[in-house]
Amino acid sequence: LKYLKKLGLLGTNVTDEGLRYLSDLSSIQVLNLAYTPVTDRGLANLASLLQLEELFLGDTLVTDGGLAHLGMMTKLKGLGLSGTRIQGHGLKHLKRLGALERIGLSGTLLNDQSLKFVIELKSLNALSLRGTQLTDASIPALQSLESLQVLWLDRTSVSEAGLEWITGLSGLRELGLRNCPVGDGLVELVCNAPQLRVLNVFGTKLTEDGVAELQKRLPDCEIIR
């Protein structure tokens, strides 16, 4: 097993103690521990896995404290933390991970105050913030993520007022606003972002006329409704 590259333990009963046996898998690049009872203590056993490129911890018992054990995984490109107890301040431990491109924080306790730790991850090109506690007040700060191409804000309270900054993300290709309180005012905002290729407005207040106008003015964009 020394040369194992991928290991999937999704939905198993693997424990923190059990993860101790993974510490010698020095070649592993992809590890999926989603939907397991793993806690911060278990992550301490993964700190030596410095070849990891993808780590999935969604719906585990991991908190901000556990992220300190990931701080030396400089090859990490993707990190799944959705559905965990993360509040956000633990993301400061990931600042040195210059290869980190994708992070999932959906369904966590992330809020306006802790978003500042997210925007320090400058290499991100995909960010999932579905179902978090973010509001219009903090969303403009995302402009500093200049490499961002995919942003999911579904099921948040973000409205048109918080999206006036959208033109500041010139590389944004996909925007998820499913079940957000946005209406036809969104049309003028996103039409200033002609590079958009996917826009999810399912469950919003956008009218039929609004959708038609979007499709007319953004002919290259797939409108999901």
Model-derived regions: residue spans:
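Concave beta-strand-loop units of leucine-rich repeat
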Residues: 1-208, 217-225
